[in-house]
Amino acid sequence: NDQLRFNRAELLEWATARNLDVSPDLFAREESSHALLPTVSQALADGGIVYGVPGGDRAAVLHAVVSVMKLPAEVDHDELCQVLLARECLGSTGIGDGIAIPHVRNPLVLHVTQPTITLCFLASPIDFHALDGKPVNTLFTLISPTVKTHLHLLSWLSYALRNPAFKEAIKRQAPRDELMLRLAAAEAAVDR
């Protein structure tokens, strides 16, 4: 048939990893309603912000991250760690500037009902094999119930990370309240 087809999730991950400026609306389908999809602020409020997460390598850090995540009781923590590590083997989720966005390749694997983003600041930076070669000290771990929600949150998070005030607050590991205010301002700066 000589047609090229691209997976939306893989395309967004590729663009995010290369720090390309991608509008969140690019991945929205016309029939979708943004009113029904959560904001990054909502997902982060549900997932939480954790400081001083230990670990000397990707595996140890991901185990520590999963242990502090607010997950439903039926989610197997060891299985989630394995899925996140398998995703890292396909290609690092380290997007540069000390930030990684670990997430499962297929959101439906976990069977969760509520999307969450857990922001973890590491006790010490680690090599996450990021494209820019810099060690990672900040992880936004994304868990979604559907591919649509996954793409929505991943694209909006990638967009928010381009906001200078939000990014600066992340770099200095600002207090929770300030981070949430900066994120809300970054989201509000874009016409939804």
Task: List each model region and its residues.
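Cytosolic covalent-transfer regions centered on His/Cys nucleophiles
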Residues: 1-192
